[in-house]
């Protein structure tokens, strides 16, 4: 976790260094708050250190995130997060500055949430018989937060751009609005993909889908966390253009999807060939069920863990 250590104060690094290496592999988030104990999220559960964050810690972390020039973080402060080397995302919370009804930036930042990005190579391979049949099937991955949706999408992007035996690599476009799938730093993906990968980083999903089709002629597009009406419109346009799409959405089940006004149309038009439901039954990445385009169960996996 050298990339994370680079932005932390020495005293905090010393406190974190006491954690056994094996436990580090299970930590999903490091949450730092002024005047509160440092919180680690391990297997979805909070673990608190005796070390409490200070105002000086917050100032130093922010300085290191910005390379000691807050001007360079202007756009990131509007979005509320910064992506650092290694693809890790640092969420920020503090006093919001508004202008003309919109968010202009953040000040007095008192909370940091470092989401640890780990690429888990091969986790999507057990799903290939369901998701690839001579070509990639249009797929929606459904799950509540922290169930491994992004990790699974990342490996599917790797597989589609790399190929395997009897599966040729295809031109794969990632529209990465939150810089989480590819973890780009200055436009360069920090995770491992194949030769045929193109990324639109920090780009709104709906606009990015259309931009990618016009500029990069992808055969497969990967998008995380769809949910707005304009996302639905853009996805349908992509499908009509003959592009395969693999996307994710927040939800507990396929029935949740049918109830959401912004996504209901995708179900009604049978936009997807496959639906995957994820849970944390056996940890992040547990595939609970797989459905076909009509909602028929293809696999009751009883908790197959991919991640």
Swiss-Prot record:
Keyword presence, Oxidoreductase: no
Spans through the membrane: none
Entry's Gene Ontology BP terms: sporulation resulting in formation of a cellular spore
Entry keyword Cell inner membrane: no
UniProt cross-references to CDD domains, sorted A to Z: AAA (cd00009)
SUPFAM superfamilies: P-loop containing nucleoside triphosphate hydrolases
Protein name (Swiss-Prot/TrEMBL): Stage III sporulation protein AA
